[in-house]
A protein has these predicted regions:
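Glycine-rich phosphate-binding loops of nucleotide-dependent enzymes
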Residues: 1-258
Length: 258
């Protein structure tokens, strides 16, 4: 399979804390790739470095054969990497439709002048953006809430809305940070089906998730972080038998990196 993303020797320090140390992994086009580990293992830090929220102290990410810009989230999104967050970050006062439209605007060409003057091209782009946003709400199963304010949606539907907004940026890689957190069993099954649908439509998925059952039943390959280092990378069945992984989950004391 073709490599989509390669993490090369990623390191990140916060003062005297080594949050990530020499993390290398390869994600192939079309797979669902899981990133797991105990609390504080460095999973979200890895996401933050990948998506430009943090600048790595060591190493680089290569995406589609080109080095990703570091410390510049908008440029990372423009390259085709989108993410959701462990703590939901929606525009709470906007409608569900408006939230998704906001995600799609990175792919439109209207400048400030076009928006102010509402020229014909801008009006047409806005119509297409609205249409696409509604399609994505339908895709994730919440189109009936298109005009509802985001803050009034249920927790599970807010998660789906955040995924729809990320998909609106037209990513090649969708990075999901604990999307099943706070979901009940029914919502988790629906999420699994949605991720499989996203993968089936050609989008590669990188998944951080504490629900190990979900990860093992969904991911093609899994990497495990412990204290900022990669201790395993394999198919789920092999990772589950890995003694270092078992020891990491039973060892406890993981509090220093996220």
């Amino acid at each position: 399979m073709i490599t989509l993303l390669e993490a090369r020797n990623i390191g990140k320090r916060f003062g005297g804390l080594q949050a990530l140390s020499d993390v290398s992994l390869t994600i192939r086009k079309g797979e669902v790739y899981g990133l797991i580990g105990p609390n504080g293992a460095g999973k979200t830090t890895f996401f933050n470095v990948l998506t430009g929220a943090y600048t790595p102290d060591d190493g680089e990410f290569v995406f589609n054969g080109a080095v990703l810009p570091s410390g510049k989230p908008h440029l990372v999104v423009a390259q085709g990497v989108a993410r959701t967050f462990q703590n939901i970050r929606l525009f709470r006062e906007l409608t569900a439709l408006e939230n998704v439209m906001a995600g799609h605007h990175i792919r439109t060409s209207a400048g400030v002048w076009g928006i102010l003057t509402q020229n014909r091209h801008t009006v047409e782009e806005e119509r297409l953006t609205t249409e696409r946003a509604y399609e994505l709400l339908k895709y994730v199963g919440i189109e009936r809430f298109a005009t509802a304010t985001a803050k009034n949606l249920s927790y599970g539907d807010q998660r789906r809305l955040e995924i729809a907004r990320a998909l609106a940026t037209e990513p090649q890689l969708l990075a999901l940070d604990e999307p099943a957190a706070g979901m009940n069993a029914t919502e988790t099954v629906q999420l699994k089906n949605l991720i499989e649908q996203i993968r089936g439509d050609g989008i590669t998925v990188l998944l951080i998730e504490h629900d190990v059952k979900l990860v093992m039943g969904l991911c093609d390959r899994v990497a495990v972080l412990d204290f900022g280092r990669k201790i395993a990378e394999d198919v789920p069945a092999e990772v589950q038998k890995n003694e270092a992984v078992i020891g990491a989950y039973l060892g406890g004391g993981h509090k220093h990196a996220h």
